[in-house]
Amino acid sequence: MKSNDLLDAIGEVSDEYIADAENVKKRRMPRWARWSCAAAACLAAVAGIGGVLLIRGGIDGGSAGGSGHEGGSSFMRYAGPVFPMTLLESNPEISAERDITMDFAPWVPVWVSNEEEAASYPLESDRQEILDNYNEWYPEGGYYRSSGNIIVKDSYILENTSAQNQTVHVLYPFVSSLKDLDNNIPSLTMNGEALGTTLHAGSYAGDFEGAWGGSSKELEEGSVNLSYIENWEGYRSLLSDGTYMDRALGDFVNLSDIPVTVYEFSDAWGTPENDKAGVTNPTIRVMFDLDYEKTQVLSYGFNGSLWDGENGIMGKQFSIRRQGESDYGSPYYIIVVGEDIQNVEYKGYVTGGWNTEKTIDAGMTISRRESNLEEALRVVAESGYRTAFEMGYFESDYDYGFELYFGLLKEHLMAYSSLSGNGVQRYEDGAIENMDVIGVSRVFWLEAEVTIPAGSYATVEAVSEKEPSYDFYCSNTANRKISGYDMVTRLGSNLIFTEQTASLEDRGRIEIVRQNFGFDIENGVNEVELDMEEPHYYLEVRAIDTE
């Protein structure tokens, strides 16, 4: 959608709808355990009449799973395949031999001291508390750590068959989320020397589904929850025609020609939480009037919304943060696209929810300014990015980090929110969900320039740590405790391959459950030649007892 068409796309919002999100306080967990409780995907809930508990947060989710499909098992959490390298522009003078090595070295336990673990946290102010926690959890001074990841070495011998030097731009694709880039981003080398790279990011590589997900999708249609790609065929559909990569290599939309009105709510205060006095979750509720046919409202930081299209009323609410809580001191924003809202007022309440009547003393500063959507979203994005970094969702503050995050945030809003003219239910409350932008899976490409001498060769190698596909521990399925890894031979690549081979470094840690590579550990067959007419190879393994 062109940005100057946006104002014409403002549509009617449902007459009355309420969505609330609980403010859950969590104890900080070890980094290795942070996402190990993803088994919470086993839970689903309905909140109130006409309300749905949105499973938000953008954390990599899973499907309902299944016994399998042609070409390997269907796992509840599919990590995506290893893709082949490609060129920015096809070159008939360049051919390639590919060798991929799957190394199970991360499965070998290594000792990690409590001091080493605490020192690895990005915020120095947190380290003593983290060390105290680890000393409590591991009084022996540390623990043995291993991983279900593998090291993938994806090597390409590029041959220049022409009489002239060939300078080409190689593109290496991989699956990740923004929050997991530190773990998943490959290193690229040519003839053993590190290459300078540019990172490109694709859009959300998935879809949306109803509140009950795959368990009864035929009964519960909708677009409330994220629905991730479940197998390699999903990536084949995503990448085959090249449009997804073309978008990733292009520029992000500029929204500076869309006028908006921005309301900033800051310095919020209120009666402190006091369970005995019935003040269980001090909350500020903001109410205003609007014409639903002429106005679109985006919001950031609020954890509850109310719509009343019949009476032309909308509400937003947030829990008053206390010092020490995440987002403490951060402002809240309402961005108005179209006709301005009217009669903005607020009041404090003892808890959240739109039926609460008991009030408390509360206050805040409200400022209003006229701006454009590009500038307004940049301010919101800076706040969201800073919060995500402080909470440890980003391990490193990449030089390209914010601008990439900001571009993807705009892209996500223009594709799926009410700004698109055909938004999904997940975002119909107008909330800017920065955690979705950070957490959803997408395909990235690393770009590097290489020169291959005339009539000669160059070796380009991508090394990365690859997560497994798996079923959640609580699932009690046939694939429980099985880790899956897979690769595709040609998908998305314009290279002319003359040969592809694969090697396995099992480290004495695994037994093969299912595969189509042809490895035979017992008989020493750890290197195989691949059939390039076979589009997909898979390896499914189980850990063996080495005690």
State the predicted function of each range.
Residues 1, 5, 35-40, 47, ...:
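Generic structural microfeature
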Residues 1-29:
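Disordered, charged N-terminal biogenesis/targeting segments of membrane/secreted proteins
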Residues 4, 22, 40-41, 59, ...:
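Intrinsic-disorder/low-complexity regions
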Residues 10, 35-61:
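Single-pass transmembrane signal-anchor helices and their membrane-water interface zones
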Residues 27-37:
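N-terminal export and membrane-targeting signals
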Residues 54-547:
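Lumenal/extracellular ectodomains and adaptor appendage modules
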